[in-house]
């Protein structure tokens, strides 16, 4: 007779529970892998003219000077929050928490959003240095500069959504003839200010990407000014090398930054067309955009390769740096043409 205090199926129950746990773990892993592939997709480029036209039709707006640039800024910011997987940088759950490529892409996009939002608030929307700033832009720009990695209280997405709402309100007023205090001034001096920001961003990205291989650099920080000084000592020659763990981070940051910049420059081509044509600089801007578009080509390897210069394997970072450097050289020439041409 079997003793009921020691059932014979106790081991089977434990085995069944372990088996169930194993299948649950495998299913969880499989679902997260699928989500990783889904989240890891970068948004496609969009047509800024179509976006502006569609937004104007949906909200009953008129496409006036500055409408395309502002609508493009809105679309890029909205895409940042609502692309596949949403905004990933501040996620604390898998698979997002173990992904770093798309969060770095998001950061690159965010930097460009912040730069254009700042220029829109301080320059594009103001006629003179003594003029009043727009209230909606005054509310929107600081919210875009909120911590990009805040999960709660308040979370990043909530702040950026508020920034988008304020920016949309500015756009509504901009296209309303009865709202004369909302303006966008497409002037050469305003565009020069923005291009100077772009120069620095692209120059910094190019330097970080070029450091994917060991580089000996001369310290040129004080060159061109015999009376210049700096806070602390730096050697006259520097050896620069990006950590292996940051190679793909820098690459995807640059890819996100150039993705956003392509759209912003396309929009500027529309709103500043008269200024650019007067300076005979429209073709120069289009060539810059074409150089940046090359940075968005498909990547055909499962990881970012980091070959050594002319070595056997490709070096994706150096290729990206080449495109960005050429675009930056074009930006510098365009800015000088607008200043002196």
Predicted regions and their residues:
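Hydrophobic membrane-insertion alpha-helices, especially the h-region
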Residues: 22-36
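Long, amphipathic, charge-rich alpha-helical segments that form helical bundles/coiled-coils
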Residues: 136-174, 284-309
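A cross-kingdom feature marking solvent-exposed beta-strand/loop segments within repeated
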Residues: 91-101, 147-154, 238-248, 301-319
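N-terminal Lys/Arg-rich, disordered targeting/topogenic segments
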Residues: 1-16
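N-terminal Sec/ER secretory leader and immediately downstream segment
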Residues: 50-159
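Charged/polar positions within long, soluble alpha-helices
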Residues: 39, 82, 86, 115-125, ...
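A cross-kingdom marker for long, charged
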Residues: 44, 48-54, 249-252, 258-341
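Extended amphipathic alpha-helical interaction segments
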Residues: 160-289
